[in-house]
Amino acid sequence: MTAFTDSSYYSQTFSELEMQDQCIEGVEFEGCHFKQCNFSQASFQRCNFVDCEFEQCDLNLLDLGYSKFSDSLFRDCKMRGVDWSKVSWPRVLFAAPVQFFQCLLDDASFYGLQLPELIVEDCRACRADFREADLSQASFQRSDLSGAQFSKTVLERADFRDAQNYHIDIFHNRISGAKFSRYEALSLLNSLDIELSD
């Protein structure tokens, strides 16, 4: 299969599609499962994903211009450099409509997004941009956040237990009620310009 010829697909499974660099526009997917598909540098323009799952897919540099997501899950996917700010998000969100498990999210951008309860678990999100985002009650458990950017980010009641390599300035982010593992939480003191000794 080289292209989606219908305008909508329901409860279908797509396996091992090779669609890198292709443009898919105005297609609705509901209850669909994408497994081991290659969408690297592809473009989903004004598409709608409802209750969909992506598993072991290559989504590097995927362009999601004006597409919509609801109750969608990404598991064990490569998603480097995806700009999530291009997605058409609902104006009011009580919980993030996407979840990430065991994904590579390096260099992804979530800049300025309102995504409360976002799940980024067991992921690598090196150099990801979370600045000015509302990620209250998000979960970053067991994720590598080396070089990830947090500034003016709402992280109240977020869960960073067993996350690694994060740098969060406690003066420029809202972290009230957030959970941290004891050892890694020492990195929060970096913004205090103090010297620790045993």
In which residue ranges do the predicted regions lie?
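Tandem repeat scaffolds
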Residues: 1-198
